[in-house]
Amino acid sequence: MSVEVTVEIPKGSRNKYEIDHETGKVYLDRYLFTPMAYPLDYGFIDHTLGEDGDPMDALVILPESVFPNVIVKSRVIGVFKMTDEAGGDDKLLAVLDDPRYDHIQDISDVSDFLKDEIEHFFVHYKDLEKGKHVDGSGWGDKAEAEQILADSIERYKA
């Protein structure tokens, strides 16, 4: 399934940016408390609503990071299932919609190392923030990710 991911945070950043959905302005929400950086470009998919009340989160595999507020045409290939202090907070995994990534069609095509890196980041990036926690519950394949995305689109429309 093709989607447009609006990147909020580039790979390698410890700055947690948030885009105001009404104004389009990019705000620095916080500098991560843990000495960790985002493992991939991270953002959201417009016109969706996750279980946490925000647009669906997505990470994008790219050859080079982009800037905050850049829209990346991507394909959803899997999902990291997790909850945090606010409830369900799944992270869709996508790849740039580009022939260089035709070999990545499903989560099984992604290296175990990259999946472990993503999981480690999200399970631990809030460790030093009081009152916050993350519980990871593993990876879902493309079909599960697409169902979660479809559900988030329906939630947005309701």
UniProtKB/Swiss-Prot annotation:
The keyword Cytoplasm applies. GO terms for molecular function: inorganic diphosphate phosphatase activity; magnesium ion binding. It is an enzyme of class 3 (hydrolase). CDD domains: pyrophosphatase. The keyword Cell inner membrane does not apply. Mg(2+) 2 binds at residues 8, 57. This is Inorganic pyrophosphatase. It comes from Corynebacterium efficiens (strain DSM 44549 / YS-314 / AJ 12310 / JCM 11189 / NBRC 100395).
